[in-house]
């Protein structure tokens, strides 16, 4: 009888040990998966924010060049060619904006990113050089502020 009880206790101990080991392994695996998921999302956000900032800079640069092409005599380049290039860069900026909006959980950041794109789009829509210079500064500062805000969401 003692042998049967000892065997039963040994079997229960083995089962309990196996169950605890399984539970600890599952917790460790779950933590690893969660960490990996968070890190991948962080990397995707970093990439999206970087691509968007770069697209805004390129689009802004094209619009500044367009303003000079339209208002300088003689124009440094054909305004129509620069305008087409600006449209292409605007499309790239909009695509990058959509990616930022999909990846960020903060609605305010998404709205701020959209507002900066609208400001950049309007940078060349003036005939006044002082207003143009003010818009250039405002858009440069807006992009810098957006980058600093986005860093907090990584």
Question: Positions of the model-derived regions?
Answer:
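Feature marks short, highly hydrophobic, charge-poor N-terminal signal-anchor/signal peptide-like helices
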Residues: 1-11
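Conserved non-transmembrane functional hotspots
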Residues: 19-154
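Acidic, low-complexity proline/glycine-rich segments
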Residues: 10, 14-21
